[in-house]
Amino acid sequence: MREIPVSQVTDTVERLCIEANTHLPGDVKRAIEACRACEDGDIAVGVLNNIMENYQIADRECVPICQDTGMACVFLEIGQDVHLTGGDLREAVDEGVRRGYTNGFLRKSVVRDPVRRGNTGDNTPAVLYTEIVPGEQVKITLAPKGFGSENMSAIRMFKPSAGLQGIKDFILETVEAAGPNPCPPIAVSYTHLRAH
């Protein structure tokens, strides 16, 4: 059994909060560049050029890619042969978020109560997902989820008769209804549960 102090989790989450908000992953950069290469509309080309310039400046200056630095979504894959020591895992993650958003000078926009709108002042609590996996490693992935994407998202429960075409129609209706409101670039995707 491998022992890992939760302080390492805190330190890693702090670092990832800053990195995720200032450095766009390579696969995302390549996708944006590929879109730019095949785009021929002047406005779209201009928007994509601005996005590319923005992430280049963010990389170089270590400043946030976007003013909406989001809610920290933390994904933990914890090896079944790991014993986390020295404190509470949930608090260790939240302390990492607290430090990352403070030390990285990132905007704190999480509210305690969505009706009363009182800001927590430190961007906690994080959204935390855990999965137990084989081995003696801990893998931490952090994704800052901007709130603009939440405001433009939609969900619908389909009857089985809707079929794939019903789902496609809903996606197109949702994108059209959102219009110019979400920040570009807009990525359309779906999520599903893995069957075990």
Across the structure, where does each feature detected by a protein language model lie?
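Non-transmembrane, aqueous-exposed alpha-helical and coiled segments at domain scale
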Residues: 1-188
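Conserved small/polar residues in nucleotide/adenosyl-binding loops
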Residues: 191-196
